[in-house]
UniProtKB/Swiss-Prot annotation:
It is found in: Endoplasmic reticulum lumen. This is Formylglycine-generating enzyme. N-glycosylated. Contains high-mannose-type oligosaccharides. Its cofactor is Cu(2+). Keywords: Calcium, Copper, Disulfide bond, Endoplasmic reticulum, Glycoprotein, Metal-binding, Oxidoreductase, Signal. The gene is SUMF1. Ca(2+) 2 binds at E130, N293, G296, A298, E300. It comes from Bos taurus (Bovine). Disulfide bonds join C50-C52, C218-C365, C235-C346.
Length: 374
């Protein structure tokens, strides 16, 4: 497929421009701490799903243990940690059960977080970790697969992760989110453009994978993408009506439990959780079902088509609408901050076109039974 014409909007509605300007003027400096009950009274409303990670290609249809400590230099270009073990890979059983999906207190109403509804889920298996660069490389080496970012010749990268040399060659940005830049040569092997590499981070989540790429990998591995309901049920880790996989406090006992943005978005990420970009797939404590980084770090694709209209009636193993334009992604990423992209909650959700990719978008797989391969 030919490289897309990179228009200024890239799928984020033009109506967000005024909201963005107002938000950037007012939101910088918000602090997220203590009990997380949503944005403070009188604060500007959060913008829509273009938020922290929704650039699109044009024309496309638990645990109480202390958080793991990793060096801030782990994500620095050229850093090659010595003695780091191979990236972990395993699936964990998710028991059958009934849970409350969504919320009656939506923090981003236009995302369709409401209403709260009872959902029954059959038992299944879920990857304990996001698919890593090393695991995705095995797939590519085995099949010769080319990702859509490689076929298009470009992908979206957060400006703060780019070198000055790469930025100097870019003339366009996403109008409603100018920190997203279309970068030629950006793909899963070169997440921050052609002068970057994943050789020093085999255990970090693979990025710049489209929904179609994720499906191809999961199929090869004898797995599938989780439904949105399965993903959210797994995210909650056996807890009911909690914001995060571990409870309602963002930092229990002052510890970081997810890789998200600290500081002023999009100006400065202080990296207080140990990372300014992605973290290893086994960083931070797992939730009650044994899932690591189920929120933060990298957005994760689900199998569902996007809709913001949900029935309040109880359902069994819902799979979303039969067709649509966008696919659902969950979990937020290292770019999420409460002031702008408060989507590192289990009930939060966003969407993107199936062929879109970005430097904060990855996935993990699910399966009805343990596969014989992968």
């Amino acid at each position: 497929m030919a490289a897309p014409a990179l228009g200024p909007a890239r799928g984020c509605g033009a109506e967000l421009t005024l909201v963005l300007l107002l938000s950037l003027f007012l939101l910088l400096g918000w602090a997220a701490g203590g009990e997380e009950a949503g944005p403070e009274a009188g604060a500007p409303s959060l913008v829509g799903s273009c938020g922290c990670g929704n650039p699109q290609r044009p024309g496309a249809q638990g645990s109480s243990a202390a958080a793991h400590r990793y060096s801030r230099e782990a994500n620095a270009p050229g850093s090659v940690p010595g003695g780091r073990p191979s990236p972990p890979t395993k699936m964990v059983p998710i028991p059958a059960g009934v849970f409350t999906m969504g919320t009656d207190d939506p923090q981003i109403k236009q995302d369709g977080e409401a209403p709260a509804r009872r959902v029954a889920i059959d038992a299944f298996y879920m990857d304990a970790y996001e698919v890593s660069n090393a695991e995705f490389e095995k797939f590519v080496n085995s099949t010769g697969y080319l990702t859509e970012a490689e076929k298009f010749g470009d992908s979206f990268v957060f400006e703060g992760m780019l070198s000055e040399q790469v930025k100097s060659d870019i003339q366009q940005a996403v109008a409603a989110a100018p920190w997203w830049l279309p970068v030629k040569g950006a793909n899963w092997r070169h997440p921050e453009g052609p002068d970057s590499t994943v050789l020093h981070r085999p255990d970090h989540p693979v990025l710049h994978v489209s929904w179609n790429d994720a499906v191809a990998y999961c199929t090869w591995a004898g797995k599938r993408l989780p439904t949105e309901a399965e993903w959210e049920y797994s995210c909650r880790g056996g807890l009911q009506n909690r914001l995060f996989p571990w409870g309602n406090k963002l930092q229990p006992k002052g510890q970081h439990y997810a890789n998200i943005w600290q500081g002023e978005f999009p100006v400065t990420n202080t990296g207080e959780d140990g990372f300014r970009g992605t973290a290893p797939v086994d960083a931070f404590p797992p939730n009650g079902y044994g899932l690591y980084n189920i929120v933060g770090n990298a957005w994760e694709w689900t199998s569902d088509w996007w809709t913001v209209h949900h029935s309040a009636e109880e359902t069994i193993n819902p799979k979303g609408p039969p067709s649509g334009k966008d696919r659902v992604k969950k979990g937020g990423s290292y770019m999420c901050h409460k002031s702008y992209c408060y989507r590192y909650r289990c009930a939060a959700r966003s969407q993107n076109t199936p062929d879109s990719s970005a430097s904060n978008l990855g996935f993990r797989c699910a399966a009805d039974h343990l596969p014989t391969t992968g």
